[in-house]
UniProtKB/Swiss-Prot annotation:
Top-rank taxon, per record: Eukaryota
Organism in which the protein naturally occurs: Physcomitrium patens
Lipid bilayer topology: Peripheral membrane protein
Record InterPro entries: NADH_Q_OxRdtase_suD, NADH_UbQ_OxRdtase_49kDa_CS, NDH1_su_D/H, NiFe-Hase_large
Pfam (any one): Complex1_49kDa
Main function: NDH shuttles electrons from NAD(P)H:plastoquinone, via FMN and iron-sulfur (Fe-S) centers, to quinones in the photosynthetic chain and possibly in a chloroplast respiratory chain. The immediate electron acceptor for the enzyme in this species is believed to be plastoquinone. Couples the redox reaction to proton translocation, and thus conserves the redox energy in a proton gradient.
Subcellular localization, as worded in the UniProt entry: Plastid, Chloroplast thylakoid membrane
Chief place of localization: plastid
GO terms of biological process kind: photosynthesis, light reaction
Stated family: Belongs to the complex I 49 kDa subunit family.
Subunit structure: NDH is composed of at least 16 different subunits, 5 of which are encoded in the nucleus.
This protein's name: NAD(P)H-quinone oxidoreductase subunit H, chloroplastic
Keywords linked to the UniProt accession: Chloroplast, Membrane, NAD, NADP, Plastid, Plastoquinone, Quinone, Thylakoid, Translocase, Transport
Catalyzed chemical reaction(s): a plastoquinone + NADH + (n+1) H(+)(in) = a plastoquinol + NAD(+) + n H(+)(out); a plastoquinone + NADPH + (n+1) H(+)(in) = a plastoquinol + NADP(+) + n H(+)(out)
Length: 391
C-alpha cells in the first residue's frame, strides 16, 4: 500500500462581500477538511476614524460615527455624546434619557435581527432571513418617523436628543412591541429545536469562562460563557436601573449558547421598551445650557440683516483638560471611547474600543481543529461588523 503524503493546502476565504461578513479575509491552512491554522487579514475598511475625530468638533463628528457599526448606529452616537457629557458634567433631562433608552433598545433589536438572518443563511436556513427583514423594516419605520433617517440617524445631541418624539409615535411603538414578541417566539419554534440546526451549532466554538475573560470578550460572547456581565447593570447609565429586566446568559459557551443569549436579549429589550414607553416623563428633550452657540456675524444682504439659519457655527463647546473612558453595552459587546481633552473644541485623542475587533481576536483559536464548514458557523456566532473592526 502506497502512503500518500499530503501537503497542507492554503485557501484564502474572502474578502467577503460587504453585505455578508464585511470585507474580512481569512487565510486558512487546511489538512483535507480539517483547519490547521487561520489568519484573519483586517484593514480593508480602515478609514482613519480616530484621526478624523481629532480635527472635528463633537457635533461635526457625529455624522461620522454612525459609519462604525452601521447596523446599530444609535450606540455609536450615544457613546459620542456621552463622552463629552461626562467630561464636562452636563446633565441630561429625564425625558431625553428615556428617549435615548428606547432608541438604543430598538437599535439593539434591529442589530440582533440582522445578525440572526445571515447567521441562519450561513448554516443553510434561508427562510429566517426574509422573516427578520420584515420585522426590521418596522423598526426602521419607527426610526424614520422619529429621526427622519432609517439608518444613519444623527439623532443624539450633547445634553439630549435632536427632536422630541412625534405625536402618536409612542402608540405606534407599543403596537410594534405587541406584534414583535410573538414573532420572536415563532423564530424560536422554527429554529431552536431544529435537529439540523442543532447539529451545526451545538458544541461548535466553545469558549470557557476563564478564557472569555482573559481574551477580553464582551457582550453576548462573554455572557454565553457563563459570565453575568452587562454594562447596563454595571455602569448604571441612562435610566436602566428604574426598569425591571434581567441579564441574559448561558453557561455552555458554544455557538448555540450565543444564539440563545441574543434571542433572549431581543425579548428583554422589548420588555425594557414597553416599560420605558409607559413611564416616560414629560419635560424638555435637551439640556439647553449645552447649546453654547458662538454667535456668528450676520451677513448683510441687500443692505438688510439676513442670516442663513443653516450656517450657524457648530457649538464651540470646549473640552476641559481631562481624560475619561466611557462605555456602553452595544449589541456586539462593550463599545468604549477614551477621550482626552486639551481645552480646545477638538478632542486631543479619541480612542475607540470596538467590541467586534476584540471579539474577533479569538477566531483563529476557535477554528483550529474544526472542519472547514464550521468556520462560517463560528464567524457568524461572533457577530462582527467590519466598519467597526477596521475603523
Amino acid at each position: 500500500m502506497l502512503a500518500t503524503k499530503t501537503k497542507p493546502m492554503i485557501v484564502s476565504m474572502g474578502p467577503h462581500h460587504p453585505s455578508m461578513h464585511g470585507v474580512l479575509r481569512l487565510i486558512v491552512t487546511l489538512d483535507g477538511e480539517n483547519v490547521i491554522d487561520c489568519e484573519p487579514i483586517l484593514g480593508y475598511l480602515h478609514r482613519g476614524m480616530e484621526k478624523i475625530a481629532e480635527n472635528r468638533t463633537i457635533v461635526q463628528y457625529l455624522p461620522y460615527v454612525t459609519r462604525w457599526d452601521y447596523l446599530a448606529t444609535m450606540f455609536t452616537e450615544a457613546i459620542t455624546v456621552n463622552a463629552p457629557e461626562k467630561l464636562t458634567n452636563i446633565q441630561v433631562p429625564k425625558r431625553a434619557s428615556y428617549i435615548r433608552m428606547i432608541m438604543l433598545e430598538l437599535s439593539r433589536v434591529a442589530s440582533h435581527l440582522l445578525w440572526l438572518g445571515p447567521f441562519m443563511a450561513d448554516i443553510g436556513a434561508q427562510t429566517p432571513f426574509f422573516y427578520i427583514l420584515r420585522e426590521r423594516e418596522m423598526i426602521y419605520d419607527l426610526f424614520e418617523a422619529a429621526t427622519g433617517m432609517r439608518m444613519m440617524h444623527n439623532y443624539f445631541r450633547i445634553g439630549g436628543v435632536a427632536v422630541d418624539l412625534p405625536y402618536g409615535w409612542i402608540d405606534k411603538c407599543l403596537d410594534f412591541c405587541d406584534y414583535f414578541l410573538p414573532k420572536v417566539n415563532e423564530y424560536e419554534r422554527l429554529i431552536t429545536n431544529n435537529p439540523i440546526f442543532l447539529k451545526r451549532v451545538e458544541g461548535i466554538g466553545i469558549i470557557g469562562k476563564e478564557e472569555a475573560i482573559n481574551w477580553g470578550l464582551s457582550g453576548p460572547m462573554l455572557r454565553a460563557s457563563g459570565v453575568q456581565w452587562d454594562l447596563r447593570k454595571v455602569d448604571h447609565y441612562e435610566c436602566y436601573d428604574e426598569l425591571d429586566w434581567q441579564i441574559q446568559w448561558q453557561k455552555e459557551g458554544d455557538s448555540l449558547a450565543r444564539y440563545l443569549v441574543r434571542i433572549g436579549e431581543m425579548k428583554e429589550s422589548i420588555k425594557i421598551i414597553q416599560q420605558a414607553l409607559k413611564s416616560i416623563p414629560g419635560g424638555p428633550y435637551e439640556n439647553l445650557e449645552a447649546r453654547r452657540l458662538q454667535r456668528g456675524k450676520k451677513s448683510e444682504w441687500n443692505n438688510f440683516e439676513y442670516q442663513f439659519i443653516s450656517k450657524k457655527p457648530s457649538p464651540t463647546f470646549k473640552l476641559p483638560k481631562q481624560e475619561h473612558y466611557i462605555r456602553v453595552e452595544a449589541p456586539k459587546g462593550e463599545l468604549g471611547v477614551f477621550l482626552i481633552g486639551d481645552d480646545s473644541v477638538f478632542p486631543w485623542r479619541w480612542k475607540i474600543r470596538p467590541p467586534g475587533f476584540i471579539n474577533l481576536q479569538i477566531l483563529p483559536q476557535l477554528v483550529k481543529g474544526m472542519k472547514l464548514a464550521d468556520i462560517m458557523t463560528i464567524l457568524g456566532s461572533i457577530d462582527i461588523i467590519m466598519g467597526e473592526v477596521d475603523r
